[in-house]
Amino acid sequence: LRDKITNSKDLKNYSEELKSIEKEITFFHAKIVDEMIKSHSKFEIDIVGFHGQTIFHNAEEKITVQLGDGKLLSQLTKKKVVYDFRHNDLKNGGQGAPLTPIFHQNLVRNIDLEWWPVVALNIGGISNATSISRLYPMDVEDDVDLKRYGKDYKLFAEDIGPGNCLIDE
């Protein structure tokens, strides 16, 4: 799959070749999801999160392209599938990595830390950092912060530069 993505020439026009690769990626993910569901049969899986395979991302210009068909994945797995995270995050002012800050928040939620804010670093293809600040009643101007970020924390996350992409082949 990696070679097919790398060698695909027509990203701009979303060629038939890319559509075929997208279908193949979706079937591959469906197989993995089915295997995970079978191996964790004691848990009821209600929903699957699927971000696909990113083949182009430019947060500054709000452009991102992922291969993977969430609707097809839902049909294949017979599960509800949440997808298109990166695109929706860009549309709403983010940088296209909406799940990482939530994961970081959950990591520190139950730790009794003396110093705030906490900054978590995620070194993926592109590195991003999440600043997690504790909210105190006097810090909250209205309910928007509480509804958006959770009861006790405010998150700020952004891409900060290259990460593993420098060593990826």
What are the functions of these language-model segments?
Residues 1-4, 82-110, 119-169:
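Glycine-rich phosphate-binding loop plus the immediately following alpha-helix
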Residues 4-7, 42-45, 75-77, 142:
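Short hydrophobic/aromatic-rich motifs at helix boundaries and adjacent loops
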Residues 8, 12-70:
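Short beta-strand-loop/turn "lid" adjacent to the catalytic site in phosphate-handling enzymes
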Residues 30, 34, 71-75, 102-109, ...:
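A broadly conserved amphipathic alpha-helix scaffold signal in soluble, globular proteins
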Residues 40, 77, 108-112:
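A broad structural signal for alpha-helix termini and local helix breaks/kinks
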Residues 42-44, 113-116:
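Short helix-loop-beta connector
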Residues 46-105:
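Glycine-rich phosphate-binding loop and adjoining helix at the ATP-binding site
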